[in-house]
Curated annotation (Swiss-Prot):
The keyword Transmembrane helix applies. Residues 175-181, 240-262 are lumenal. GO terms for biological process: post-Golgi vesicle-mediated transport; protein transport. Residues 203-218 are annotated as: Interaction with SLC9A7. Keywords: Endosome, Golgi apparatus, Membrane, Phosphoprotein, Protein transport, Transmembrane, Transmembrane helix, Transport. Residues 1-21, 51-72 are annotated as: Disordered. The keyword Chaperone does not apply. InterPro entries: SCAMP. Widely expressed. Belongs to the SCAMP family. Functions in post-Golgi recycling pathways. Acts as a recycling carrier to the cell surface. This is Secretory carrier-associated membrane protein 2. It is found in: Golgi apparatus, trans-Golgi network membrane; Recycling endosome membrane.
Amino acid sequence: MSAFDTNPFADPVDVNPFQDPSVTQLTNAPQGGLAEFNPFSETNAATTVPVTQLPGSSQPAVLQPSVEPTQPTPQAVVSAAQAGLLRQQEELDRKAAELERKERELQNTVANLHVRQNNWPPLPSWCPVKPCFYQDFSTEIPADYQRICKMLYYLWMLHSVTLFLNLLACLAWFSGNSSKGVDFGLSILWFLIFTPCAFLCWYRPIYKAFRSDNSFSFFVFFFVFFCQIGIYIIQLVGIPGLGDSGWIAALSTLDNHSLAISVIMMVVAGFFTLCAVLSVFLLQRVHSLYRRTGASFQQAQEEFSQGIFSSRTFHRAASSAAQGAFQGN
């Protein structure tokens, strides 16, 4: 029966693999605790790969720390405001100095205008009588008033020519009628008086008014020129015995069969009529310009008062009167 107990498939030598000396040696070796296990303690760990340094600057990159903006202090605000005020003050001082310089230049220009040599009337250099006035429309008269001022100057010239023609007409009248010697004498007197008086009494005031925008000069012109228009009306009528060869005097010569003398006197009467019409027209033009300037009679009074009180002649006269009154007492 023992023969049946034998395993035919069994190894004749019963070998236990776990009884192998190499295995038992490993299993009997002391095992360290799990806590003492260090996977990085092996000497055969991964080798370290050297890092290749990039070419370039040897200085490391430095990040600038960001600085948050701080609120300005009150002292800084005050200092900035003071600096702005100082700059504005310097700018104002510079502008004031520039204005003062321009004002001095303007005063020098005006002074140079005043010291210019008189050029009217245009007399030759050898004449012993020198010019009495300075007249330059382009320099002294504003551009808006130059045209009307020249027209008034031409009217004065026409006025002078008409008076001279009136003298010749009265001479012809006197040559045809010996009883008209008074008219001829008065015509000479009118020519000698009215020619310079018209220039001084109404042309020069309007010239000064346009030059300096003086209300008082405007009122002087209006008053004298209105009287001049009245004289023109009397002259164009031609009342005999007044030295005017107007329409009545010219028509009266037709009875004496002096046609040539009558024609000459009618031409002069036409000149007087033309002067009267132009005077009325120019008076209206000047008055309209005067109204646009906004001047008034009160302003003219103030200018007249300032001119009187600032006059050296008035001061001397007042001082002389005061001294005389004091000595009399």
